[in-house]
Amino acid sequence: MADAEDFCPHLDSIGEVTKEDLILKSKGTCESCGVGGPNLWACLQDGCQSVGCGESYADHSTLHAQDFPSPAHPLKSVPIAVGDDGESESDEDDIKPRGLTGMKNIGNSCYMNAALQALSNCPPLTQFFLECGGLVRTDKKPALCKSYQKLVSELWHKKRPSYVVPSSLYHGIKLINPLFRGYSQQDTQEFLRCLMDQLHEELKEPILPENQEQEEEERDDQREGERGGTTEEDFLSCDSGGEMGDGEGGGGVGTLSEMELLIREEVGRGLSEKEKLKERKLSYCHRRTSSEQADEDADVDTAMIPEPDNDAYMHCSSRSCSPHPVESISKHSSTPPRSSPLRTAHSYVLKKAQVLSGGKKRSEVRYRSVISDIFDGSILSLVQCLTCDRVSTTIETFQDLSLPIPGKEDLAKLHSTIHQSTVIKAGTCGDSYAAQGWLAFVMDYIRRFVVSCIPSWFWGPMITLEDCLAAFFAADELKGDNMYSCERCKKLRNGVKYCKVLRLPEVLCIHLKRFRHEVMYSFKIGSHVSFPLEGLNLRPFLAKECVSRITTYDLLAVICHHGSASSGHYISYCQNVINGQWYEFDDQYVTEVHETVVQNAEAYVLFYRKSSEEAERERQKVVSLAAMKESGLLQFYISREWLNKFNTFAEPGPISNQSFLCAHGGIPPNKYHYIDDLVVILPQSVWEYLYNRFGGGPAVNHLYVCSICQVEIEALAKRRKTEIDTFIKLNKAFQAEEAPSVIYCISMQWFREWEAFVKAKDSDPPGPIDNSKVALTKSSGHVQLKQGADYGQISEETWNYLLNIYGGGPEIAIRQTVAQYQDPEHLHGEQKIEAETRAG
């Protein structure tokens, strides 16, 4: 972090001003107009004691600066660290920086406290909740994003307490997932996934499609589908060091000062919006394959089913996954543990963004949120048939990587494979890679030789995080019980499955699989895994098509578990963004530690952030431009959310103003009343620099309510009212019937979607009526109700009304057949005659 004098060379011209002097002047009045505070500005020029009012009054402070020019620029607070109120670092921060606030244990809640502290020390996420409060809005219960925003504000407030009690968030997470109810110890990784999935669900925004990008995506899909005979090498980066793969797995707006408050000298990270849109199409909703030939067998959703007993498990974010059968693939004999035995208890993983099965024609809507922007990456999984060489591809979105901890035999096999591949690929991947490969080979050989001289029972196998990554991405043979069902061969074949990273996330969450749960017992793998504090390089694991330029990561936080598989305690080590020091967060106790303590920790979950010196220089340049008085005739509005990305992302991507614009270029009517929370005003020079550097847009010089959206909203409200009123009227008439001749059945799954739409809980109308899950079609073609089906009963008029609007089917009618009533004596006589006739 740059020193203050390095940031501004004009500080030498400032006179000696004490804190008491400033407090006294803040209680005074403007020397020109006599107005009182709080918006007063004191001139810090040596020998000048002037105090003037700010721009909310007559702005005499600016007039004074113009009359008595000095080499110092009157910046309106450009802090260089995370803050809740835009103030620069104070003397108090030098003693105890913000963010060093503990959390009280609310009964075995250390798993939650450790996870929240780790997330709190992820600057991209924390800055969003501190600076972009206007986007933290939701109508969905339990509004966990509001609870989290409040918690982050308390943790990073300048008047922070020694510890806080996260009771609101604690109760909210219990409402979402029954797994966390009660006071038993839970898995911190399960909590992280549940929390981030819910935050995404509450904060998600639909992605506005663009025709040009859609055409490009379709062309890319077509190219992917033409890879029928592609080999593994076609998908590997030339920087790879070995066999890679495996695929499991309008109102008032902000002022210039607001813009300056958001431009900070922090280490920032990011990703391209165009790339993000492209990957979302391939990974959101159903994790559909990227080619028409891609197999459904390879489309695995590890977040929805019990985790297979294999080494290559990847948590696919539920935002982009849908339930499918899993191809259980066993990789090594010493299989690493599952993170939790309760994988099937995830009730929160089903998302509205998913395309519902059963012939539904509902248009596919893709979503994004701050969670997906920061934590989502994508992996290209490939399965190759060894008979016909057909390659099936799948692009999967991941929120975290669950890595195996390889055993001694696995390490030997892994290193042997890597060394062989290094020798083979050194001549084909360029001189720089060859030199790097041989140097790594020699150093690794020496290290392994030294370790081999010491008894393994004393030293144990040396395992690095890179070893775990290599084990995760190692090729997996599909044979025996795990043979591959090839669509081209139409039978089971031997195959190979491998995967590569297609897009790297801004913050990489890595989960080490330390816990293994069997039917009769559970145990914990206590092997030490060494991990780098800086410079984690993922380039060897990238696909050639990878869109991420920055591939190195620095450690932000690490969560550790002390104890056994059945009991224990969670703590976290986090690096403070203000002073760069490492701290141990143990519930309500926060202690500074040396980085060697962190390196020797038994890591369970690690958070890495993209590192980029170029991004820091870009922010320095923008700060300098913002401080200059030269400005054009135009002022530009820019998304506060994108500006936060620029401040905290390594790759912020093109400028995107879609957070406050509609598809027609105006302000959506529902956002206009808080538009000042969504935008920041930029001077022309700053906008031109950012636009020339990053592209994107669109440029916005005037804010207005979109009249087209207003008409659409009114028409939608009218449609909803008409449909729900008509349904209530028809249903009342149906309830009044004593013996209806026919009753129609309707799928409750579809009905719940329609109900959510007409009650304005869902913005999109449902697709056609889908009764396929409750209908049973016999060989004769007759359709009847499936036994135990989830259905509702409606009248014929109601069915016809909904059918005329939405279409669909099939029709399932239950007809009442009433036998003709006959007199008992007459019937008895007929039966007697019939019996006598038979006897005769």
Swiss-Prot record:
The active site is at C110 (nucleophile), H569 (proton acceptor). It comes from the Eukaryota. Residues 205-254, 315-342 are annotated as: Disordered. It catalyses: Thiol-dependent hydrolysis of ester, thioester, amide, peptide and isopeptide bonds formed by the C-terminal Gly of ubiquitin (a 76-residue protein attached to proteins as an intracellular targeting signal). The keyword DNA-binding does not apply. Residues 242-254 have a biased composition (Gly residues). Residues 220-230 have a biased composition (Basic and acidic residues). Keywords: Cytoplasm, Cytoskeleton, Endocytosis, Hydrolase, Metal-binding, Protease, Repeat, Thiol protease, Ubl conjugation pathway, Zinc, Zinc-finger. Residues 101-611 form the USP domain. SMART domains: DUSP. Residues 333-342 have a biased composition (Low complexity). GO terms for cellular component: centrosome; perinuclear region of cytoplasm. It is an enzyme of class 3 (hydrolase). Residues 613-706, 715-818 form the DUSP domain. Gene3D superfamilies: Cysteine proteinases, DUSP-like, Zinc/RING finger domain, C3HC4 (zinc finger). The keyword Zinc applies. GO terms for biological process: endocytosis; nervous system development; protein deubiquitination; protein K48-linked deubiquitination; protein K63-linked deubiquitination; proteolysis; regulation of G protein-coupled receptor signaling pathway. A zinc finger (UBP-type) spans 6-117. Zn(2+) binds at C30, C33, C53, H60. It is found in: Cytoplasm, Perinuclear region; Cytoplasm, Cytoskeleton, Microtubule organizing center, Centrosome. Belongs to the peptidase C19 family. USP20/USP33 subfamily. This is Ubiquitin carboxyl-terminal hydrolase 20. It comes from Xenopus laevis. The gene is usp20.
